Amino acid sequence: MNRTISKIKKGIKNPSMVRSKIFHSILMALVKDDEKYVKWDYWWGLGKFPNLDNPQTYNEKLCWLKLNARRPEYTKMVDKYDAKEFARNIVGDNYIIPTYGVWDRFEDIDFDALPNEFVLKTTHDSGWVIICKDKSKFDKNSAKKKVEESFKNNLYYYHREYPYKDVKPRIIIEKLMVENGGGGLKDYKFFCFDGKVKMLLVATGRTVDTRIDFFDRDFNHLPFKRKYPHALKPIAKPENYDKMIEIAEMLSIGIPHVRVDLYNINGQVYFGEMTFFSGGGTVKFEPDEWDYKVGEWLKLPKE
């Protein structure tokens, strides 16, 4: 009951999210062809259909990649457990957030063996985590319901992002990472093109009031937005920024485009995840000219 009330409140606060879910539910039911689906999905986000015969913008090129550059190895790179192993093999263990375990079933988790604090999420899904700061107060029933709900999801179908289609749903529990001073963690998301960082976004206030700012490789603020407003205060260049660039580029070698998400916690860099289609290729740039500018960096493969 409380969960239902929470969903209703969330829908009231964000009616556009409700409309999007309704539209995509109808689209998934009616349109099975991937190309037709991608075109209508793009239309919903940007108000027009993409030019897939001669894509020019960043969003159009992401849509083209979804349909034409399907590499099976990408599946492991988006699996939240396998991606850590992929990164570990390239950059080493020092940059990987410790994992306490991975399970196929919630019932198999031995919570008595876990530390007092941890983070629980699923390996195939996105957009949520469960943070436990005191195991004695951890609501297992609520967590189990959230996991069961997540296990029903397959991110492939929402935007036709093919790497997610065959990711096995599992539960992963990791160490809770905390910034000294109590500030929330910042997400640093590096947009890599053929193994080179061209820009990054910094996400702040993720749990309360999400703000997103874009920067070029030299950490100069870029004058555009995508979906979220800019931060209220200037964002300082993080410590070990050059190391973050180095790690992102090591992980993106040989890939036309991938977003490498990193954390910089108390001066230590940690790998987060990898994303091949930022925003699903359906999120507007404001102003629109930046969709074309960023699109120039993405060189589509000939395969």
Predicted regions and their residues:
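Short catalytic/ligand-binding loop motif for oxyanion handling, primarily in non-cytosolic enzymes
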Residues: 84, 107-110, 126-131, 139-140, ...
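Coil-to-beta-strand transition motifs
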Residues: 94, 183, 192-198, 255-257, ...
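Phosphate-binding site of ATP-dependent enzymes
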Residues: 114, 138-228
